[in-house]
C-alpha cells in the first residue's frame, strides 16, 4: 500500500506501508491536515478527526 505522508495536498511525497490502510488527521479548519500516514490510529479522543481508508485516494 502506498500512502501520502505530507500535511498538505500540494506535497505529493508518498511512503510504502505494510498496512492495508492509510489515514489523515484533520482539524476543524477546512483543508488543514495535521498528519498523514500508514495504518489507522485508534485513539478514541481523536477518532472523529482521523479518516482511514483502504486506498491512498482518500488520503489526498
From Swiss-Prot:
PROSITE patterns the record matches: SNAKE_TOXIN
Highest taxon of source: Eukaryota
Keyword Disulfide bond among record annotations: yes
Cystine bridges: 3-22, 17-38, 40-52, 53-58
GO cellular component, one term: extracellular region
One Pfam family hit: Toxin_cobra-type
SUPFAM superfamilies listed in its UniProt record: Snake toxin-like
Localization terms from the record: Secreted
Database matches in Gene3D superfamilies: CD59 (2.10.60.10)
Tissue specificity of this protein: Expressed by the venom gland.
CDD domains, alphabetized: TFP_snake_toxin (cd00206)
Gene Ontology molecular function: toxin activity
The UniProt record lists the keyword DNA-binding: no
Keyword set, alphabetical order: Disulfide bond, Secreted, Toxin
Family stated for the protein in its record: Belongs to the three-finger toxin family. Short-chain subfamily. Orphan group XI sub-subfamily.
Protein name, UniProt field: Toxin 4.9.6
Taxonomic source organism: Dendroaspis viridis
Amino acid at each position: 500500500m502506498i500512502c501520502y505522508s505530507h500535511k498538505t495536498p500540494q506535497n505529493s511525497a508518498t511512503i510504502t506501508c505494510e498496512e492495508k490502510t492509510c489515514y489523515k488527521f484533520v482539524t476543524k479548519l477546512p483543508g488543514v491536515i495535521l498528519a498523514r500516514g500508514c495504518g489507522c490510529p485508534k485513539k478514541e479522543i481523536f477518532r472523529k478527526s482521523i479518516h482511514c481508508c483502504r486506498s491512498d485516494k482518500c488520503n489526498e
